[in-house]
Amino acid sequence: FPSDKLNFLIRKGNWEDKDVGHDRTIEVKNGNNVEVWLIQGDENIYYDKKDVDTSPKLVSALMDSKIDLLVTSAGNIEDSELDSFKLIDKTDNKEFKTSAIKVSDNKIKLTLKKGLFRTPEIDPSHDYEVSSNNFRATKVTMRKILDDPEYFYNGDDLGLTYTKDSSIFKLWAPTAKEVSLVLYDNEGTYDENGKVTDNTGGREISMKKEDKGVWSLKVDESLEGKYYIYKVSFSDGKTNYAIDPYAKAVSANGQRGAIIDFSSTNPSEWGSVKKPPMLNPTDSILYEMHVRDFSISKDSGINNKGKFEGIAEE
C-alpha cells in the first residue's frame, strides 16, 4: 500500500444504507497484508478473530412511531422467543409492556401495550434499550417517530437571528437532554488535519427546551465577531460539540459558526439590484459552476484562472 492506512465503508445494495454511521480506517501495521474482522452494526475493527464476539445479538431497534419499533437481529428469531423481548427506559429505570410480531426471519415489530388508561409515552430524549432472552441488547435509535407532528417544527428561524443589540439561537434537537451555547473570541486552534478538536475554554450558556424539540436562547448583548458552537448532552452520558447546522457563516473547514452583521458586508448598491419575481419555485432551473473548470482553459481569455477574481473580469 502507498499508505499505512486504508479508509473504507460498507454499503447495502445500491447505497440504500451503510453499515455504521461513518467511514472507518484499517491500519496496515506490518507489510502489505492485513486481515480484519467486521461485525454488522459494530463500528469496531478487529484484527484478531478471537477478539470478535459472535454471540447472538440485536443489531438495531428503530423507534418508528410513538408505539412501534422495528427490531433487527443478527440471526433468525424463533416464534417461541417473541414473548421475551423487552423495552427498557434506562433513564427512568422502567420496563414497558410490549407485544411482538415477526416481520421476517430476523426482524420483529415491537409494539407498546396500552395501559389501564392510556398508552405509555416515549420521550425521545431518554435512553432506551431492547433486550431478549437469547439476544444481546441494543440501544434504541429514534427514527420515524421524529416525523410525528409533536416534533415537526416548520418555523423559519432555526439557527442564529442577529441584531446589533441581541442574538437569538435556536436548535432542533428533540433527542438531547441538555443543550448549551458555547461562545468563543476566536476560531480555535487547528491541528495538522485542519480540525479544531479542543472546544474547551468557551463561555457556556444553557439553552431552554421549547415545543417541537427546539432549544432556544436569547443573548442581550452585541456578539458581532464572536464564534459559537453547541454543546449537546444525551441521556446515555455522551456529549458532543456540534456546529450549528443552520449557520450562515463559519470558520475555516466549518469548525465553528461565525457571528457576523451581514448588513455590513453588502457591497455598494447591493439593495438597488432588482431580481425578477419568483412566480413558482418549482419552475426554477439551477446551474452549478466550478470556478476552476469555468476559467482554466487557455482560450478562456481570463487572466486570473481558477480564482473568483477571474470570474469578475470584464
Which residue ranges define each predicted feature?
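Short clusters of hydrophobic/aromatic residues that line enzyme substrate/ligand-binding pockets
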Residues: 26, 207, 259-260, 270, ...
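Short, solvent-exposed loop/turn and secondary-structure capping segments
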Residues: 181-184, 192-194, 228-231, 240-245, ...
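Glycine-rich phosphate/pyrophosphate-binding loop
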Residues: 239-296
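Short, solvent-exposed loop/turn segments at secondary-structure junctions
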Residues: 15-16, 176, 235, 291-296
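Short, low-complexity, polar/charged sequence segments that are solvent-exposed and flexible
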Residues: 188-190, 236, 248-251, 305-310
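Aromatic- and glycine-enriched glycan-recognition loops and surfaces
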Residues: 160, 211-215, 219-222, 270-274, ...
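Insoluble glucan recognition modules
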Residues: 1-211, 217-224, 277-287
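Extended acidic/polar, glycine-enriched regions
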Residues: 204-260
